[in-house]
């Protein structure tokens, strides 16, 4: 039996199937796969009267419980990508929609599930990890790495420490190694003259498209993702898909996807410079093995391997 299914992802941008990132990309890739087996599947980024008048079998909404008040649906699935504590739910007017609607919750990590308030009266709570979009699947392997390292976390916490260490302990000892910073707006780094950072081989790249990220990831030797406040961290599995190991504290949800074979876990900033030099000096065979392990590990996050859990959850 075919069901009327709606994926709702609230965004001010037009839902362009090719050019999008983050939550939008996840919704659209999952939507396209579900539509292949259930033709009456739709996606929208804004509420309309037409949506409100239609009787839905299932509505899957990303981070927004308020939409359930306006849609007629037999089953309501709230797809959690971010934390929603009680005080935030009140501030965002989401508490009452969660309480009065019978909602099934899907969390993208065990960490997020455990950090979500137990006071919410969800019908069901299930963990389904996020997945790699098509751009990051089945990439050509590059074993000839340059002395490059990347930072792609959009929040700046810890980055100032990394920059200071890079200037004082890394660049001063090896002026060939480079750090590329992606994803951050310039206003997040007001302390620094970004142009002057280049003399220390630190390059601020801003927000770029996926093909540019892949270009740098497949050339680099490591990604710095400390793990502060990450409910899943797509950056990590994207790095793995490019054969790129992680340097991390192993905190929050990042700890669920890091191990000694795909990451260099450090206990504090004091270990960062020695870890960078350790990676630079890896034996060729060790680097090759680590690259292969990262790529193979990333395949568990291919949509084809996550998809069966979604179809069971939707009852397809």
Label for each model-derived stretch:
Residues 22, 270, 288-314:
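A charged, aromatic-enriched C-terminal amphipathic alpha-helix characteristic of glycosyltransferases
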Residues 112, 128-138, 184-186:
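Short beta-strand->alpha-helix junction loop in the catalytic core
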Residues 140-158, 163-167:
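Conserved donor-binding/catalytic core segment of Leloir-type glycosyltransferases
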Residues 190-211:
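Nucleotide-activated donor-binding/catalytic signature segment of Leloir-type glycosyltransferases, i.e.
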Residues 215-220:
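Short alpha-helical donor nucleotide-sugar binding micro-motif in glycosyltransferases
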Residues 228:
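Aromatic "clamp/platform" in nucleotide-sugar-dependent glycosyltransferases that forms part
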Residues 245-248:
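Short hydrophobic beta-strand element within catalytic cores of glycosyltransferases
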